Amino acid sequence: MSNDLDERKRQILWAVVDDYIASAEPVGSRTLAQKYNLGISPATIRNEMADLEMLGYLEHPHTSAGRVPSSKGYRFYVDGLQPIAPVTDAEKAKIHDWYKGRVRRLDEVFQETARLIADVTHNVSLVLAPQAAQSTFRMLQFLPLDLGHAIAVLMTDAGFVENRIVEIPDGATFADFQRMAGAVNQTLSGKALCAVTKQDLRRIRDAIGDESIFVAAVEVMHRALEGREDGRLYLGGTAQLLSNPEFQDLDRVRAMLLVLEREDLVKDILHTHAGEGLTVTIGRENESSTFWDSSFITATYHVDGKLLGTIAVLGPTRMEYAKAMRILDYVNTNLTEMIYQLKW
């Protein structure tokens, strides 16, 4: 809470933010007097709102007699929402049904999480999947494709999966590749992909014996790491931007979409905003002016104490913070549990 506000100003500011989030219309003193039990006259409310504007908590649009919250006003409101309220029974049921009906494999979790968050919050969702290089090797498996080819499947504990078609060299058999998978699994089990050493590779080569088959194994692991310093980014609900009154300016929306199309920029934003627990970055707290009319809510997810990735909601500064925060917090817990269950 802000120390420069007395209790009456806090009540009025809270009411202004709450009403503006619900209505998207500038809030006047008469509206507050009618809808909220403040126990004071519209004239007194009007004077207090003028003080709140002078203190930087409210802004006065030129085309309206009412006022809207500033980034500072929203910050007051969001800080007052702690601790986060639990999800409703209906929200909980939808989240559980979504995962139950749509997720069968670990590699489906992240895309469906992005779709779920966007669907429930009606905002843009961002899900940063685990980094391949930091993931712990789980298993290399080969599946027969035809006489001359097999499908190599590399899996990690964090849900990363790399599929690649490999050629079976002349003189080799599918059984040779199965033997090679056994040697790789025995040597690398429980080891981070980025920690694989030359000594590990020598052990695998010695166990396999055949140089051409060994090269195929190394190529699969190299492919898994190539360009994967960060995990894959999943977006959901970008069309939701146009449903908000704040984003009827097409130039503003176009600028946001251009940034969202740049995976490297979005990952930088998520890394900047991510912290312990739930982090809310509001309006002009964002470094990029493209998002000065937007807010990010981010959360990091962990398995076995290891940081795996980030999930986030992007919406207008007028977003329904209470709902978005409780949804993201609950989905974050379920995502962690889902990864843990499906990795075994």
What does each model-identified segment do?
Residues 4-5, 40, 69, 87:
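Alpha-helical hairpin
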Residues 1, 82-83:
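Generic N-terminal leader/targeting and pre-domain segments
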